[in-house]
Swiss-Prot record:
Keywords: Repeat, Transferase
Main function: Overproduction of CaiE stimulates the activity of CaiB and CaiD.
HAMAP family to which the protein is assigned, alphabetical: CaiE
GO function terms (MF aspect): transferase activity
Protein name as annotated: Carnitine operon protein CaiE
Presence of the UniProt keyword Chaperone in the record: no
Compositional bias per record (Polar residues), positions renumbered to this chain: 187-196
Pfam family, any one: Hexapep
Length: 196
């Protein structure tokens, strides 16, 4: 793992969290229990404080950053999709930010909300609970349905389970030169399927 102290501040990572070895955590970063931080994620706490609360996940290639005297927060069980950028914002408890979305300074995403993939949430946006946000700039299009929230929670549970699976079995290795016969397929821990 790449952890860097900055001006006397050292990242804090709960022992039950999983941080991928290629992720980078700098300075004022606080990672809670059972959090998953994916490959190539960059959490730069060299200006503002970055807080990732219990059970949340920050997936591959995500960036977290913020201005001085601000907190960038991912709430409990927050779900941040691949390549998303969070800058000086607050993501509410049990909310999902879709892949490659950008959430700007001072924006607040409400609890149990979903930000669709590729959305741009403008600085200062103030969301409400359980909104579906989409577009560039993002706007609330409707409420998140019970089925959508259930789907989100199953996906988040997969990442929470992945924490333990990574602690138990992830290690650096050399590639095989050819595929073995009867190569097994990996299985998830829930019955979640892709949204279509």
């Amino acid at each position: 793992m790449s952890y860097y102290a900055f001006e006397g501040l050292i990242p804090v990572v709960h022992p039950t969290a999983f941080v991928h070895p290629s992720a980078v955590l700098i300075g004022d970063v606080i990672v809670g229990a059972g959090v998953y931080i994916g490959p190539l994620a960059s959490l730069r706490g060299d200006y503002g404080r970055l807080i990732v609360q219990a059970g949340a996940n920050i997936q591959d290639g995500c960036i977290m950053h913020g201005y001085c005297d601000t907190d960038t927060i991912v709430g409990e069980n927050g779900h941040i999709g691949h390549g998303a950028i969070l800058h000086g914002c607050v993501i509410g408890r049990d909310a999902l930010v879709g892949m490659n979305s950008v959430i700007m300074d001072g924006a607040v995403i409400g609890e149990e909300s979903i930000v669709a993939a590729m959305s741009f949430v403008k600085a200062g946006f103030s969301g409400e609970k359980r909104q579906l946000l989409m577009g560039t700039p993002a706007r609330a299009v409707r409420s998140v349905s019970d089925d959508e929230l259930h789907w989100k929670r199953l996906n988040t549970k997969e990442y929470q389970d992945l924490v333990g699976r990574c602690h138990a079995s992830l290690h650096e290795t050399q590639p095989l030169r050819q595929m073995e016969e009867n190569r097994p397929r990996l299985q998830g821990t829930t019955d979640v399927t892709p949204k279509r």
